[in-house]
Structure formats: C-alpha cells, structure tokens
Swiss-Prot record:
Family to which this protein belongs: Belongs to the dethiobiotin synthetase family.
HAMAP family for the chain: BioD (MF_00336)
Residue ranges the record marks as coiled coil: none
Enzyme class: ligase
Protein name: ATP-dependent dethiobiotin synthetase BioD
Recorded metabolic or biological pathway in which this protein acts: Cofactor biosynthesis; biotin biosynthesis; biotin from 7,8-diaminononanoate: step 1/2
Catalytic site positions: K38
GO annotation, biological process: biotin biosynthetic process
Enzyme Commission no: 6.3.3.3
Source organism (scientific name): Buchnera aphidicola subsp. Baizongia pistaciae (strain Bp)
Cofactor(s) the protein needs: Mg(2+)
Claim: Cell division is one of the keywords in the record: no
Encoding gene, per UniProt annotation: bioD
Alphabetical UniProt keywords: ATP-binding, Biotin biosynthesis, Cytoplasm, Ligase, Magnesium, Metal-binding, Nucleotide-binding
Binding site for ATP: N13, I14, G15, K16, T17, V18, D55, E116, G117, I118, G119
Length: 227
C-alpha cells in the first residue's frame, strides 16, 4: 500500500499526536478512507472499567473508517514508560507479527493510513527489536515531527541520521510550535531547512484546544501522497 505513513518525533511530547490528527483530517478533506494506528501505547486511563490510551482514542476518533479500539491500539501498557521496561516487569512480549497483522487489517479497510510511533525511532520493545526494525520490515515512509524549542536542531539532525542509517525512507518533516510566542521559531526552521535531507511539509501553529477546532481551522501542511 502506497499511502501508509509512519510518524516519529525528536522526543516525547513534541506533537506526534497533534501532527497525526491534522494529517488524518487533511486526508479526510481530500476524500480518503483514513485509519489511524497506534500499535503500541504506554500510559492509560480507565473509563467504564475499560482501559484506554488517550492518543489512541484521538486517532480512532479522527479516522473516517469505523474501527474498534483494539484495531487502533493492539498493545496497551498501563505505565507511561518504555515498553521494554514494562515487558520485563509484567513478563509480556511485544510481537512484531502482531503489529504487522494489525496493520494488514487496516489496509483492507483504508486507502490512507497514519501510524503513530511511541517514544522515538529506536525505542526498544525487546532484546530482539526496536521500533525502526518494524518500520523497515513494513517498508513504511517516515515523517519526522520536530518540536520547535531550544535544542531541536541537534535532536532533528541526530534523528535524521538514525532514520537514514536504518535504511528507512525519510519522506518529510513537520515543525510543531510548542510555545505561543518564540522569537527564534523562524530561525530554527530556516536552519532546519538547510540541514534536513527531506522536504519540509509545513508547520503547526501553537493552538490551544486544537482537537476541538480541527474540522474548522485552515491546514497549511502538505498532505503526503504517493500515486
């Protein structure tokens, strides 16, 4: 499947979910049958005696295809820590084949899929594999979300090297403004444009309560497509 995208970030809490939701909304506006996929999530809440991850709930909400929670998020860990740690603690193992079978189910229902990673590109899930191993196995096109703040240039360049050295396709990058005002936002982006080896897809302005406005706000990010 051509339009199947993997979102990774330079760090945690830098805008992977916001970027994912905006891209799902943009693909909806273009008329695609969209599915969001969060194969592994750490940190959950409980409602009506059911456990869920808030990022996965948002991906499900903004998918145009009707999906069960389990289809969006097959692996859910209670503690908001690295899955490798919770694997060891709870004697659980993340199976790469389960991640792949979940993706295959979504491919049968959708023609545009957005996969949101957990942590960073090399987040370990066991002694045998890290996130980038599965991305490569599935031949997914990678989009990097860069949270614009002090230190982001170094983080972005290091993550870019990790993407390329892992043999992944680096399709593009998104700048996410983490602060309402920052004198150096444009300076950061100008420097990133000179150092990134993939296209700049656009920026996301700092927008409080963005999820409540998503259907109405203008979106300036370019929709990643492959014909």
């Amino acid at each position: 499947m051509k339009n199947c995208w993997f979102i990774t970030g330079t760090d945690t809490n830098i805008g992977k979910t916001v970027s994912s939701i905006i891209l799902l909304e943009l693909a909806r506006r273009y008329g695609y049958n969209t599915s969001g996929y969060k194969p592994i999530a750490a940190g959950c809440r409980t409602n009506d005696f059911k456990q869920y991850n808030s990022d996965a709930v948002l991906l499900r909400k903004f998918s145009t295809v009707k999906l069960s929670y389990q289809e969006v998020n097959p692996y859910l860990f209670i503690d908001p820590v690295c899955p490798f740690f919770t694997n060891e603690k709870n004697h659980m193992n993340v199976c790469m084949n389960k991640l792949s079978s979940g993706l295959q189910r979504l491919k049968k229902k959708s023609n545009w899929i957005l996969i949101e990673g957990i942590g960073g590109l090399h987040t370990p899930f066991s002694n045998e594999f890290v996130m980038s191993d599965w991305i490569k196995k599935e031949n997914l096109k990678t989009i990097l979300v860069i949270g614009i703040k002090l230190g982001c240039i170094n983080h972005a360049i290091l993550t870019q090297k990790a993407i390329l050295s892992s043999g992944l396709e680096f399709f593009g990058w998104i700048a996410n403004y983490l602060l309402p005002t920052d004198t150096y936002n444009l300076t950061h982006i100008d420097i990133l444009k000179k150092n990134m080896k993939s296209p700049y897809l656009g920026c996301i302005a700092y927008t409080p309560n963005i999820y409540n406005q998503i259907h109405h706000i203008p979106i300036t990010i370019k929709l990643p497509l492959q014909n």
